[in-house]
Swiss-Prot record:
GO MF entry, a single one: DNA-binding transcription factor activity
CDD domains: RHH_NikR_HicB-like
Cofactor annotation: Ni(2+)
Record-stated family: Belongs to the transcriptional regulatory CopG/NikR family.
Alphabetized Pfam families for the sequence: NikR_C, RHH_1
Species of origin: Rhizobium rhizogenes (strain K84 / ATCC BAA-868) (Agrobacterium radiobacter)
Biological function: Transcriptional regulator.
Manner of cofactor binding, per the entry note: Binds 1 nickel ion per subunit.
SUPFAM superfamilies recorded: ACT-like (SSF55021), Ribbon-helix-helix (SSF47598)
Keyword set includes Metal-binding: yes
Binding site for Ni(2+): H77, H88, H90, C96
Keywords, alphabetical: DNA-binding, Metal-binding, Nickel, Transcription, Transcription regulation
This protein's name: Putative nickel-responsive regulator
NCBIfam families xrefs: nikR, PRK01002.1, PRK02967.1, PRK04460.1
């Protein structure tokens, strides 16, 4: 591990200290490492569409919007190879929240996410990519015992 020195303005340092306290980090170094790691991960994912990754796609939609539930289901079935699991929550009488866990290449997953969140009636779409150095399940079988 390398030690570096950086210069940060007071307002930014105050924000970093607040994040550190809120999340329970033991030091600024741990906070900065995680923040930098997150930024680097997002940049890597954005650069190479062939990078293997895991992802979560979270979105809220109005289930009463004409044919939306059917269109979303059709879209998911057309991309079944990317889907690991989907959680469906009835938020209230009008809205549903879905969280899809995905695996595949960045390009495939971004394309799928775009086809979901751009549908009329879908709101609050968020895609979180986690690049995988090894492709999904390249490590072989494992046990939780």
């Amino acid at each position: 591990m390398q030690r570096i020195t950086i210069t940060i303005d007071d307002d930014l340092l105050e924000t970093i200290d607040k994040i550190s306290e809120q999340r329970g980090y033991a030091s600024r170094s741990e906070t900065l490492r995680d923040l930098v790691r997150d930024a680097v991960t997002r940049e890597q994912a954005a650069v190479d569409s062939e990078t293997k990754c895991y992802a979560t796609l979270t979105y809220v939609y109005e289930h009463e919007t004409r044919d939306l539930s059917r269109r979303l289901t059709t879209t998911q079935h057309h991309h079944h190879d990317l889907s690991v699991s989907t959680l469906h929550v009835h938020v209230d009488g009008h809205d549903c929240l879905e969280v899809s866990v995905l695996k595949g290449t960045v390009g495939e997953i971004k394309s799928f996410a775009d086809s979901v969140v751009t549908q009329r009636g879908v709101r609050f779409g968020n895609l979180h990519l986690i690049p995988s150095e090894h492709g999904p399940h390249d490590h072989g079988p494992h046990s939780h015992d």
